[in-house]
């Protein structure tokens, strides 16, 4: 069966839900897709809630581990929505997920207010450069006291303000459960609130200015074999555009290879080209499954080079932010998380600097054990034992 062509008629925006594990991110994602399906059925597929909440680990512990990608349209825009994992153990996915957002919906239960993970996600959103956050105050059907809701709202605004986000952002009172279930009390009211939330998303989260004119680059998130066709890599195009049948280089981790992209798909639809912001799958000619891996990038030939030695400027998280409890010294060996993967590196502090304390802003040299496609300005997280302990950017490439 011939696949539908993907039509680029409306502005495309990547958003996601972030926040504490039991506050209803996945239920809200399902409610948004249901309400929009009912309002604009010709452009919005119907998603089953279980499709969004489908990680196998989930049934046992009720926590979202994987990232669900769904798409929907409002009158003004086309959205790709990621439902981000909510648990601290899965911060690594949070980093790859949050890096995919032009804006985020922070879900906070009115019954609980902001929790530790709420704070961690807002901090992470700041670190990975999510430009705007607005708030869905969920479970409002379970709180009778308006004053209590106002207090929680104020607390959320303070939290955003502390992390460099706009405290005057839209805060929409919702009940994801009430909107999702036709037989819930006040169902119509909660459906209207979801519409109000999406109006706020349309108006408040700016249409991203994608770097279309820069050379093509796509970080590889996943690699598949499609029998009879070959190797497909998936990811979100970071910049530039790529017509089908173009040559690309596979850069990082291993020696650079050149290949041709023979097919481009997004959300199971064929495309003639992909561009910055698209979540896409690219079929690579003559490349085996074991020749390519997550953490590499596909790039326009000659546009980016692999490096192991650089200087970085880093903010080191405090203990309260979930960072280290003690200082580190030269020869400290954490992981450096670039785009989609961790690579171990050795830190060399500058002369005259004996140690770096939690809460410090520091500049130091790094030598990675594997090369990464790197440019000045590239951001990374410093991680240790599964926890983010620092956030930085490459200031100078050495070799």
Swiss-Prot record:
Enzyme class: hydrolase
Catalytic activity: GTP + H2O = GDP + phosphate + H(+)
Chain residue ranges for the region called G2: 62-66
Location of the tr-type G domain: 10-209
A molecular function GO annotation: translation elongation factor activity
One GO term describing the cellular component: cytosol
G1: annotated span: 19-26
Keywords, sorted A to Z: Cytoplasm, Elongation factor, GTP-binding, Hydrolase, Magnesium, Metal-binding, Nucleotide-binding, Protein biosynthesis
Renumbered residue ranges of the record's region G3: 83-86
Listed EC numbers: 3.6.5.3
Binding site for Mg(2+): 26
Compartment(s) of residence: Cytoplasm
Region (G4): 138-141
Stored InterPro entries: EF-Tu_GTP-bd, EF-Tu_GTPase, EFTu-like_2, EFTU_2, G_TR_CS, P-loop_NTPase, Small_GTP-bd, T_Tr_GTP-bd_dom
Region G5, residue ranges: 175-177
Binding-site residues for GTP, renumbered to this chain: 19-26, 83-87, 138-141
UniProt xrefs under SUPFAM superfamilies: EF-Tu/eEF-1alpha/eIF2-gamma C-terminal domain (SSF50465), P-loop containing nucleoside triphosphate hydrolases (SSF52540), Translation proteins (SSF50447)
Coiled-coil residue windows: none
Role this protein plays: GTP hydrolase that promotes the GTP-dependent binding of aminoacyl-tRNA to the A-site of ribosomes during protein biosynthesis.
Subunit structure comment from the entry: Monomer.
Family the entry assigns: Belongs to the TRAFAC class translation factor GTPase superfamily. Classic translation factor GTPase family. EF-Tu/EF-1A subfamily.
This protein's name: Elongation factor Tu
Gene that encodes the chain: tuf
């Amino acid at each position: 069966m011939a696949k539908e062509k993907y039509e680029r008629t409306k502005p495309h925006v990547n958003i996601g839900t972030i926040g504490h594990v039991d506050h209803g991110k996945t239920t809200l994602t399902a409610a948004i897709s249901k309400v929009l399906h009912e309002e604009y059925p010709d452009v919005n597929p119907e998603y089953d809630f279980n499709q969004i909440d489908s990680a196998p680990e989930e049934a046992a512990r009720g926590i979202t581990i994987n990232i669900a990608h769904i798409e929907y349209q409002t009158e003004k825009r086309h959205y790709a929505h990621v439902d981000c994992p909510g648990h601290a153990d899965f911060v690594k996915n949070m980093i790859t997920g949050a890096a995919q957002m032009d804006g985020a919906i922070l879900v906070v239960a009115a019954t609980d207010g902001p929790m530790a993970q709420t704070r961690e996600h807002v901090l992470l959103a700041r670190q990975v450069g999510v430009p705007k956050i607005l708030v869905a105050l969920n479970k409002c059907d379970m709180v009778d006291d308006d004053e209590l809701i106002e207090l929680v709202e104020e607390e959320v605004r303070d939290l955003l303000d502390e992390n460099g986000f706009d405290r005057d952002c839209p805060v929409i009172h919702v009940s994801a459960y009430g909107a999702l279930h036709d037989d819930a009390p006040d169902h119509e009211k909660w459906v209207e609130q979801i519409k109000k939330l999406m109006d706020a998303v349309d108006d408040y989260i700016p249409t991203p200015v994608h770097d279309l004119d820069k050379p093509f680059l796509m970080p590889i998130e996943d690699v598949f074999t499609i029998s009879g066709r070959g190797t497909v890599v998936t990811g979100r195009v970071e910049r530039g555009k790529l017509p089908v049948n173009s040559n690309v280089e596979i850069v990082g981790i291993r020696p650079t290879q050149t290949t041709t992209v023979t097919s481009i798909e997004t959300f199971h639809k064929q495309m003639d080209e992909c561009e910055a912001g698209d979540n896409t799958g690219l079929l690579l000619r003559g490349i085996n499954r074991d020749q390519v891996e997550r953490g590499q990038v596909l790039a326009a030939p000659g546009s980016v080079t692999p490096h192991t030695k650089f200087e970085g400027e880093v903010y080191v998280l405090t203990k309260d932010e979930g960072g280290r409890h003690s200082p580190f010294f030269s020869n400290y060996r954490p992981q450096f998380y670039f785009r989609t993967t961790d690579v171990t590196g050795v830190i060399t502090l500058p002369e005259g600097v004996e140690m770096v304390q939690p809460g410090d802003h520091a500049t130091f040299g790094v030598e990675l054990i594997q090369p990464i496609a790197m440019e000045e300005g590239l951001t990374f997280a410093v991680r240790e034992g599964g926890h983010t302990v620092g956030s930085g950017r490459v200031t100078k490439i050495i070799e």
